[in-house]
Amino acid sequence: MGSRALPPGPVQTLIFLDLEATGLPFSQPKITELCLLAVHRYALEGLSAPQGPSPTAPVPPRVLDKLSLCVAPGKVCSPAASEITGLSTAVLAAHGRRAFDADLVNLIRTFLQRQPQPWCLVAHNGDRYDFPLLRAELALLGLASALDDAFCVDSIAALKALEPTGSSSEHGPRKSYSLGSVYTRLYGQAPPDSHTAEGDVLALLSVCQWRPRALLRWVDAHAKPFSTVKPMYVITTSTGTNPRPSAVTATVPLARASDTGPNLRGDRSPKPAPSPKMCPGAPPGEGLLAPLGLLAFLTLAVAMLYGLSLAMPGQ
């Protein structure tokens, strides 16, 4: 599947997604709650856009599937996150919630496989938060490719594209595209149950029911493979999960090898043993004096004997 591949045909199921977590991206957050709400395109194609200056929020489709779970994050929630979501690590532990694990990934996979394909995940600010965070959680389990057959879109980009051209003032305040602001702008009231995963998913569905057929056309043209999303963060560990040694473990033994005995194999250039012909501590060449002196003495003795034999001819 290419990095710019579009779905093989019209998206059949929109999977509205929201995650609550322990904090912002810089803190390497962990998921505390997730909700997926699956709606078939048939449920949206037959809808008419809400009418009037402040229409009431539409009722969700009668036929939909929903998966909502709280998750033990394994780290402390930031005070701000706990205040917004109403969840804390202690509360989740007290309720016996389990971690984001392989069983949960299988549950998500099973939920998706019950829906007609192609699937498209839809999340508000998904490109910057929900999708990268979900990819990070999958990667930590070694299951980074578990959802690679899904597609995804960020509903903020969709709403900006679908908004009427003259709806924003060039000189007025910058229009907010937070989920609460968009919902209030469309329906004249704040969304119920904000900052719960299920409440935000239902609010997002209501927003997408504003111009449902135009939304479906935009999704078909702009959905991207979930496999192209980069994880929000990557955590490397040294306790059996990373087969490659770190720089520290690779260099420290080599540094110690030159300072220890010959049993270590780090020193590949052992010093040669002293020659048996050399006296330890003597200058080179001094060991040759003894044999040279003996040779000179024998030569002198032979010469003297030869001289004596010449001096005694009568014998």
Curated annotation (Swiss-Prot):
Its EC number is 3.1.11.2. Signal peptide: none annotated. Binds 2 Mg(2+) per subunit. The second magnesium ion interacts with only one residue. Substitution with Mn(2+) results in partial activity. Residues 236-315 are annotated as: Necessary for endoplasmic reticulum localization. It is a peripheral membrane protein. Mg(2+) 1 binds at residues 18, 20, 200. The keyword RNA-binding does not apply. The modification Phosphoserine is found at residues 78, 167. Major cellular 3'-to-5' DNA exonuclease which digests single-stranded DNA (ssDNA) and double-stranded DNA (dsDNA) with mismatched 3' termini. Prevents cell-intrinsic initiation of autoimmunity. Acts by metabolizing DNA fragments from endogenous retroelements, including L1, LTR and SINE elements. Plays a key role in degradation of DNA fragments at cytosolic micronuclei arising from genome instability: its association with the endoplasmic reticulum membrane directs TREX1 to ruptured micronuclei, leading to micronuclear DNA degradation. Homodimer. Interacts (via proline-rich region) with TCERG1/CA150 (via the second WW domain). Component of the SET complex, composed of at least ANP32A, APEX1, HMGB2, NME1, SET and TREX1. Within this complex, directly interacts with SET; this interaction does not result in TREX1 inhibition. Also interacts with NME1, but only following translocation to the nucleus. Directly interacts with UBQLN1 (via ubiquitin-like domain); the interaction may control TREX1 subcellular location. This is Three-prime repair exonuclease 1. It comes from Bos taurus (Bovine).
